[in-house]
UniProtKB/Swiss-Prot annotation:
It comes from the Eukaryota. It comes from Lychas mucronatus. Residues 1-21 form the signal peptide. SMART domains: Knot1 (SM00505). The keyword Disulfide bond applies. Its main location: secreted. This is Neurotoxin LmNaTx3.
Length: 83
């Protein structure tokens, strides 16, 4: 019984974490995208994304992409211009 409860709690945590997080190009407080180099291999972007409480980050199409951001994080919208 104890194992079933622990397993249920684990599944709920995974589901809720996925529901309450989002992915995207992070936007700074100055409304700018973080630019990066494809050769960066997680260094710069991962550090930027972690500052915004994301799970991880990497360079994607010359901009920092973050995985697992909190819902309050500001991410880029498709038809909007950023500095």
């Amino acid at each position: 019984m104890q194992l079933k409860i622990q397993l249920l709690m684990l599944v709920l945590m995974i589901v809720l974490t996925d529901v309450y997080s989002k992915d995207g190009f992070i936007v700074s407080k100055k409304n700018c995208l973080y630019r990066c180099s494809q050769s960066d291999e997680r260094g710069f972007c991962n550090a930027v994304c972690l500052r915004y409480d994301a799970d991880s980050g990497y360079c994607r199409t010359g901009k920092c992409w973050c995985d697992g951001l909190p819902q309050k994080a500001n991410i880029a919208m498709k038809n909007k211009n950023y500095c």
